[in-house]
């Protein structure tokens, strides 16, 4: 009996101290994404950015800059800085796909985002993405956390 109790305590300790290492297992590193092609661009692990754009987001439900202009085939490194106290997202898409996805998020607010064109950025944190844009012009992006899109974060 004594040996059973002696084994329970170390087991509980191991579980408690290993939990933090699993707490962010749903987040992929950039190199872990599979190649993908969409109507607004593509991702593959070996992309090299020709320029870097820092996108700041805040609790006033705004992005800065509000617009990103790109050339056809341009590869950008996007650095997302959450300057707020709330969780924010940066999701690339078309105006239609973003509006549709925002509606879906209202029904499924805990839906995971695990695509290379999506960044879930905790308060005070930075995240990066690299993306190859398919066409020149302005590209749509938004925060799809329920309420943020409707408050103007698009």
Regions flagged by a language model, labelled:
Residues 1-9:
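Bacterial N-terminal signal peptides that target proteins for export
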Residues 18-20:
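N-terminal signal peptide c-region/cleavage motif recognized by signal peptidases
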Residues 24-36, 62, 115-154:
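Extracellular/periplasmic metallocenter environments
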Residues 45-75:
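N-terminal edge beta-strand
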Residues 54, 89-93:
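Beta-strand signatures of extracellular beta-sandwich domains
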Residues 80-82:
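Asparagine-centered strand-capping/turn motif at beta-strand->loop junctions
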Residues 96-107:
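Short aromatic-acidic-glycine turn motif
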Residues 106-114:
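Short beta-strand and strand-turn-strand segments in soluble, beta-rich domains
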């Amino acid at each position: 009996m004594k040996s059973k109790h002696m084994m329970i305590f170390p087991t509980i300790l191991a579980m408690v101290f290993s939990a933090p290492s699993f707490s962010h297992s749903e987040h992929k590193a950039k190199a872990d994404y599979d190649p993908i092609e969409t109507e607004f661009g593509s991702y593959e692990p070996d992309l090299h950015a020709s320029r870097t754009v820092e996108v700041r987001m805040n609790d006033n439900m705004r992005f800065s800059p509000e617009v990103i202009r790109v050339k056809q085939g341009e590869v950008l490194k996007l650095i997302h800085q959450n300057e707020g106290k709330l969780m924010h997202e940066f999701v690339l898409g078309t105006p239609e796909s973003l509006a549709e996805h925002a509606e879906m998020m209202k029904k499924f607010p805990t839906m995971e985002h695990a695509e290379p064109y999506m960044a879930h950025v905790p308060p005070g944190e930075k995240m990066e993405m690299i993306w190859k844009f398919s066409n020149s012009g302005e590209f749509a992006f938004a925060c799809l956390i329920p309420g943020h899109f409707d408050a103007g974060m698009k």
